[in-house]
């Protein structure tokens, strides 16, 4: 079976979907699994042994489009090569118009996603052929696993795995950073893709102070 995972970004969203990738591969070891992702965050998935084909796209031309015909025109040239994989099924973990559009353009006859109430853009439901209803209150990782399980018919795994690929270059870079550290250290990540997701600098300062007081 040829399976397409549609999860374009962001970094956190990709990490939340990795357990579903692991579960699909464990349940279907002979499946051909592709993942379509935004170019800007594709490094998270490059070299991942569980992925047969990593398809990197730039969906800027789709942003802000209000009509599906406009979105299809804007992104069509980039995604025509999707059809050569002859996907049997596409699973839209994103729940947006642009992700559902990519699933549609892939040529997959079965296009699975969350039920309308679980979609971030509910009107994108029209591009899906099948949906899975999951409880709203469960963790997003388990929501994604429930979608994958419902779409492909496997039993939910007991163990949640995060198959993050690392290259030798990543290891060298991390070792160099650790070598410069003196004693124990903590890692704080103040960055974010959206202003609404950024924590105040003062709060990072308070956190750093408390870490130092407790563990310094």
Task: Indicate where each model-derived feature is located.
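Catalytic machinery of carbohydrate-active enzymes
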Residues: 1-216
């Amino acid at each position: 079976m040829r399976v397409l995972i549609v999860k374009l970004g962001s970094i956190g969203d990709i990490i939340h979907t990795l357990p579903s990738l692991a579960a699909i591969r464990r349940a279907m070891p002979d499946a051909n699994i592709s993942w379509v992702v935004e170019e800007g965050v594709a490094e998270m998935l490059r070299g991942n042994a569980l992925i047969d084909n990593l398809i990197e796209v730039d969906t800027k031309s789709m942003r802000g489009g209000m009509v599906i015909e406009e979105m299809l025109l804007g992104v069509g040239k980039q995604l025509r090569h999707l059809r050569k994989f002859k996907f049997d099924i596409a699973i839209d973990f994103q729940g947006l118009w642009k992700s559902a559009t990519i699933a549609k353009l892939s040529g997959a006859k079965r296009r699975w996603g969350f039920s309308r109430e679980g979609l971030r853009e509910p009107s994108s439901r029209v591009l899906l052929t099948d949906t899975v209803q999951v409880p709203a209150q469960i963790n997003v990782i388990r929501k994604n696993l429930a979608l994958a399980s419902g779409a492909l018919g496997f039993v939910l795994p007991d163990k949640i795995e995060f198959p993050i690929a690392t290259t030798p270059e990543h290891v060298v870079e991390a070792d160099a950073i650790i070598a410069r550290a003196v004693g124990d250290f903590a890692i704080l990540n103040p960055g974010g893709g959206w202003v609404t997701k950024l924590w105040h600098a003062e709060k990072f300062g308070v956190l750093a102070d408390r870490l130092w007081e407790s563990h310094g």
